């Protein structure tokens, strides 16, 4: 679900968030972005 990506996908310091996006897409969301080093699904 949406919140599981926050724990599973670490967000890198310099904006690399492919892992976050992939996690969110697998969870059924459009994608994800990083805010304050946490993955947020969109």
Curated annotation (Swiss-Prot):
Q: What is its main location?
A: secreted
Compartments where located:
Secreted
Listed Gene3D superfamilies: Knottin, scorpion toxin-like (3.30.30.10)
Q: Which Pfam families match?
A: Toxin_17
* Annotated tissue distribution: Expressed by the venom gland.
Q: Does the keyword Lipoprotein apply?
A: no
Disulfide bridge map: 5-23, 11-34, 20-39, 24-41
Q: Which family does it belong to?
A: Belongs to the ergtoxin family. Gamma-KTx 1 subfamily.
Fill in the domain comment.
The presence of a 'disulfide through disulfide knot' structurally defines this protein as a knottin. Has the CSalpha/beta fold, which comprises one or two short alpha helices connected to anti-parallel beta-sheets stabilized by three or four disulfide bonds.
The protein's job, in short, is:
Blocks Kv11/ERG potassium channels.
Question: Can you name this protein?
Answer: Potassium channel toxin gamma-KTx 1.4
């Amino acid at each position: 679900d949406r919140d599981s990506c926050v724990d599973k996908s670490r967000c890198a310091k310099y904006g690399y968030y492919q892992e976050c996006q992939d996690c969110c897409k697998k969870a059924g969301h459009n994608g994800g972005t990083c805010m304050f080093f946490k993955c947020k699904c969109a």
